[in-house]
Amino acid sequence: MPDIRPYGSWASPISAALVAGGSSRFGDLAIGMGHAPTLTWTVGRPPAGRNVLVHCPPDEGPRDLVVEPFNVRTRVHEYGGGALLVAGSRIFFVNDDDQQIYQVGMDSAPVRVTDAPGRRFADATWDRYRQRLIVVSEDHRGAGEPINRLDAVWPTRGGEPIAIEGGKDFYASPRVSPDGTSLAWVSWNHPNMPWDGSDLWIARIARDGTLTHREKVAGSLQESVVQPEWSPDGLLHFVSDRTGFWNLYRFRAHRVEPLISMSADFARPPWTFANPTYGFASSEQIICAYVTRDGWRLASVGTRTRRLDPIDVPYTQIEQVRVAPRHVAFLGGSSAAATVVARLRLDTGQLTVVARSREGDIDPAYVSHPATIEFPTTNGHTAHGLVYVPVNPDYRGPVGERPPLRVIGHGGPTDAASRALQLAIQFWTSRGVAVLDVDYGGSSGYGRGYRERLRGSWGIVDVDDCVNGARYLAERGDVDGDRLTIRGGSAGGFTVLCALAFHDVFRMGVCYYGVSDLEGLARDTHKFESRYLDALVGRLPEHAARYHERSPIHHVSGLDRPVIFFQGLEDRVVPPNQTEFMVDALRRAKVPVAYLAFEGEQHGFRRADTIRRALEAELYFYGRVLGFEPSDELESVPIAHLPGSGTFRGDNSTPRR
């Protein structure tokens, strides 16, 4: 029989150390074009989170190809992605320390092929007719904003990249046609983000390798075009949201034709480079992934019939779709399984798990599977979320007691809740804390209209949806309405602080590298996001009053609930001063506050020790504020101005009286 213990105090086999050190983080994925294709991918491994390059030939196990002192990662746009390119037997990667391109062989050490200090590279494509790379570059040598453009790099020459296209603020997805005569790419300008409005271009490649006869194919200030790819027979395909959802199109005879029209997104917001959702098995067959409110699905699309046929795979989170003539490889995850590198044989349906993000299984008896909910929110709208109820076969809560709720506001804010198994969520549900992962208005995966609910309303719509989601579950009787909490990172951290400053629903908050001062963020953040707030809040200086009204730093008087903050001191996306100003203001206002800062961490913690310490500090903070005693041995966290409520095991601090 299960023991009866208060929610939050259940003992769990899912420890903070397991969450921090038990999983690797897959990044880029590539597939060879042979009959039995080779797979290559990058993976960040604990404890340091350094990205290793892994190579897996057919009928062999994976082996590390690039390891320390290298770290396979690009910092273009700060978020990176597209640090790997496999072109036949050639493997190229970007090294984090110097941001230069290297080439590596099966039995040879990496060799640097660029000598361009102060420049970063990403999202390369191979021009086999000219034996060169065409790559997105970001030049940080001058004063002011870095300069983005497309460069050509000849691996055998080394040295200086040559600019072949420039003049726009941003570039992505250069792709050479199969016959080598044309180049396609995407560009956009301030103040747009690529999911707001972007343009797809093609140009002829002249004999000397320069670009001529540029032609705009699609895109506008109100149309987002992403992921250009050439079919084997030379037709340009892409994804556009011109009809309200990111759907597949092609460009034939100088006309744009829809390939699939449905209320589903065949792309995700391109925060990072080179995360494709489709590819070609042949000129007549596309393998793709798309998302609805029920999660991601894999499918086959006939380019002649324009018919979509679902492919049954046991995953609801699908990324990095890479296609060869008889195979598709992808990153797949579900609520029951952590992310894997999977390979599917298209003719037989044989599915092979090539690599796992974590070794060893979590006992399924301790896993909480999410329920998809749609709940009423402000202005007659509905919003979406994933509900995880407490699950632990060893315990149940006391009769009449309901569990506390942990509401999660995802980052971005133009992003979405993951459908893969997340030990960071199971850590809480296995201890008796319910979780609501909110896809608030502005999230991706529900079409352009849902994304644009946040236009001009960041700090309002997202907050209202988190508040109303929590209220919905409390009124339904699922959770304890007096123990509602909220957690968020980055943009989600801003949502946390706004929810605490402008509403009285949540008992406490957890803020990871969150935004507290919108004007400061607009002034200090990096180029890629430097005009993001124009759409989310309004243009400066015209809307300076709105920035002030929405910034939690100016509303400390309304924020009287305990908050714990976490910050990486090398964060260039949300600089540390955003957290430090808020912590200082709350301390002066005598609001209960705790703050943990981490040397060497950037935007999104990567080191296992950091992740473990932060998660344990959260649990300690929850116990002190909500009044339960965690079963874990926990290092104490200094909490300023928290009225004493006794101590619990592992707490070495002196409670305030």
Functional labels for PLM-detected ranges:
Residues 1-25, 57-79, 104-120, 150-172, ...:
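Multi-bladed beta-propeller domains
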Residues 27-30, 36, 43, 50-51, ...:
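Non-catalytic accessory segments flanking enzyme active sites
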Residues 33-35, 86-88, 127-129, 178-179, ...:
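Residue-level detector of Asp-centered blade-edge/turn motifs that repeat once per structural unit
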Residues 39, 91, 133, 183, ...:
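Hydrophobic beta-strand positions that form the internal "hydrophobic ladder"
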Residues 43-52, 72-78, 93-101, 115-121, ...:
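A flexible loop/linker signature enriched in serine peptidases of the S9 family
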Residues 91-106, 110, 122-126, 130-133:
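Hydrophobic or amphipathic alpha-helical targeting/insertion segments
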Residues 141, 191, 357-482, 489, ...:
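Cap/lid segment of the alpha/beta-hydrolase catalytic domain
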Residues 440-657:
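Active-site-proximal cap/loop segments of hydrolase catalytic domains
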